[in-house]
Design a protein with these regions (language model features):
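Short beta-strand elements in bilobed, periplasmic/extracellular small-molecule ligand-binding domains
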Residues: 4, 23-35
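Acidic, metal-coordinating catalytic cores used for nucleic-acid/nucleotide bond scission
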Residues: 8-15, 35-46, 61-74, 93-98
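Short, solvent-exposed amphipathic alpha-helices that sit
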Residues: 14-24
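Short amphipathic alpha-helical segments and helix-helix/interface helices
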Residues: 20, 74-78
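Short amphipathic alpha-helix with an adjacent loop that forms part of the alpha/beta core around
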Residues: 47-51
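Phosphate/pyrophosphate-binding and catalytic-coupling "lid/hinge/switch" segments at subdomain interfaces
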Residues: 80-139
Length: 139
């Protein structure tokens, strides 16, 4: 039963180092750091999903950082249910076991999941804007 972390390196996200530190202190044996220029394909995320085994724990920075919308969320939750994977989202303050963030309510979770498509789209838009600016500056 491994503890594994995943974070997408978004250019505009200031909490990246804090999240990595949290994952390390929690005891993650591996922390996957996906580059934002690979956001569309996310090969490391896909590889991580293939490697997770029954009873593992997955620590993510935030659901909108790891998932891109409601359809992916539904697949992800079913995948974790079937494989009995504990999911911990640091900034959403969600622990599927209910141990780490007992103050998080059902309403909080519903609001987080309801806002997921909008937050994921904003993340992609900001990353695309930064990439566009890098291209313009380099030409």
């Amino acid at each position: 039963m491994a503890k594994v972390g995943y974070i997408l390196k978004a250019d505009h996200y200031d909490g990246f180092n804090d999240d990595i530190k949290w994952m390390e202190q929690y005891g993650c044996c591996r922390i996957v750091q996906e580059s934002s220029d690979l956001e569309k394909l996310r090969p490391q995320w896909k590889q991580l999903m293939d490697c997770l085994e029954r009873g593992d724990e997955l620590v993510i920075s935030k659901f909108s950082n790891a998932l891109r919308g409601s359809r992916e969320l539904a697949f992800f939750l079913e995948f974790c249910r079937v494989k009995v994977i504990r999911v911990i989202s640091i900034n959403d303050r969600i622990d599927s076991k209910g141990v780490l963030f007992p103050e998080t309510t059902v309403l909080d979770v519903l609001n987080i999941f309801g806002a997921l498509p909008e937050e994921a789209a904003a993340l992609r838009k900001a990353s695309a804007h930064v990439e566009k600016l890098k291209t313009v500056v380099n030409t």
